[in-house]
Amino acid sequence: MDLVELDYLSALEDLTFNSKPIIHTLTYIAQENEPYAISIVNAIEKHIQKCPPNCKLPALYLLDSISKNLGAPYTYFFGLHLFSTFMSAYTVVEPRLRLKLDQLLATWKQRPPNSSSLEPVFSPIVTAKIENALLKYKSTILRHQSPLLANTSISSFSAPIDANINSYSSFSDPASSYKPSLPSVPFGFQHISGTSPSPGFITLDSLLSDVNRMIVTEQARFIKNPYDNMAKKRFEILLQLKNVLSSSALPYDQLLAIKNQLAQLEKPASPSTSSVATSAPSVPSALSSISSTPFMKPSIPSTIPTIPSAYSASVSSQPPLTHSYVHPGPQSHKYSLSSGPPASLYNANALTPEESSSIDSLFANLQAAGLVPPSAGGKSQGPQASCTEAVSLTADIDLSKSSLATPRPKLSSLLYENYSNQCANCGRRYGNDPESRKELDKHSDWHFRINKRIRESSLHGINRCWFVMEEEWVNSKEEEDLITETAQEIEEQRQKQMESVRSQYVLTPLDPIAASEPCPICQEKFQSVWHEEAEVWVFMNAVEEEGRIFHATCLQEVRPSENKHSNTNTSTQNLAEAAVSSNIKNATGDASKDSQPDVQNLLQGIDIQSILQALGKRKERDDSMDSMSSKVIKQESK
């Protein structure tokens, strides 16, 4: 018994009444753990056998929900022992609950709701077997209740019984109701007589159900033995075939060819003569109790052969079991996904040369029909091979607790080969191609900047005023990994930007009053200097906006870092207007007190000495130009 079966059994203990949320949750768990369908089916069947009679109906409702909503492979595994599971519950529940079980059985003979498949939930062979047993059971009860029905034949209540259907004598005692059943044959291979049935019309749904069943078998085999390359190859081919059947509409002749190839693929090597000889005598002994049941003797017509002979005829004509993981009874040896199988079962899983040749022939026929690309079967070279290997290795991985606990050494080697370079700080992995190495270098530089920032921030505390403003944070872009400039380069760029701001100038106003006005922001007066290139008197580090002169650096500090929002510009202008208006008021107040202007205050911002020197230089240059022009004129006259 594996961990999945134990966990699901513990979850089934809460299903003590007909609760739709609990049934829905358990159905969802079964859907998530579909690779372990055998364990979940084992748990449900054990729960139905051991739970009290009042809890059997909710458990059968859970079985019904899983079968109708999930379908294969659960319907296949449930169908193997559905007869014993259903009848063991039917014989012990109250009479009022048997009507609900009859209604439940009627729904199993119809196709599942919201399903495109026309096939019923369970095989008609299984449901007919249960119906015949129910009719016999009800007729037996009626004979005991009414003496008039004592001599009534059961054949008057039921249709003719199949030769290989077991009688219901084993269910008279509830304690012994779940005994190990006889080896059952998959639904597609069951016979009524020794002759094989004629193949019916092949549909896409039936072919998909066969492929799904074989996928589950090969997946369980591959999980049990990860180093079985042939099982892995079969699993990959079946997955490709399922994708082709699901995505394309194939003609009937191709469906028939695929069906024949699947039938050849399912046929294992015939068992040895000794194994058949040792197992054959056990069949009549196992059926002796069934054939000797008192009330079953008059029910079987004389034209139908006895059960042991019919069974031996069907065994001699039928092919061996194709499903290596046939669900056993509770008293037999358990084969779970976590415990090792017996030696005989392990030998049965080993592929023979006949199976290997059938795999190759199936793959060759699929390639010839154009259903599988030619590169899918061979071993490709280069990156495509690693991608194909990764897809094949991760096909059966499920993000569940039990699946993640399964060791997969091939996946580890695949990770180390494809992502060989690892970051020493955080463990992040990169490939070995040039682009991946560049990404690793950028990632290492990012670690260096972050570590340096952490070391610097640990030396001093963090002040709230250092945080960026809300608008600046909204307009900023996080490009930390893309920054490659050093701190020195950033400082040089900032110095160049400030030099370009300080190099702005405004011509010195001719009006002495306007020239003496200070900056509206810092209230410092401007210094008039001579500009050599423009050859005029200017105010350096100054800009003029709306008739007012500002320091360019002051205006740069007052404005936001990005001149994109008009509201911030308006607030700056309002601040400047307020400063200018206050200065004007002060000036008008002083003028009212003293009507005569103060000459010293007017000439305070003007460098008179520099002006006189510049005028002298200009006069000398003009005189030299006049003298040179006069000499040129005299020479021309001569």
Curated annotation (Swiss-Prot):
Entries under SUPFAM superfamilies matching the protein: ENTH/VHS domain
Signal peptide limits: none
Domain of life: Eukaryota
GO molecular function: mRNA binding; RNA polymerase II C-terminal domain binding; RNA polymerase II complex binding
One GO cellular component, as annotated: cleavage body
Protein name in the entry: Uncharacterized protein C4G9.04c
Positions of the CID domain: 1-138
InterPro entries referenced in this protein's UniProt entry, alphabetically: CID_dom, ENTH_VHS, PCF11-like, Pcf11_C, Pcf11_CID, Pcf11_Clp1-ID
Sequence segments annotated as region (Disordered): 318-338, 615-638
BP GO terms, sorted: co-transcriptional mRNA 3'-end processing, cleavage and polyadenylation pathway; termination of RNA polymerase II transcription
Pfam family, one: CID
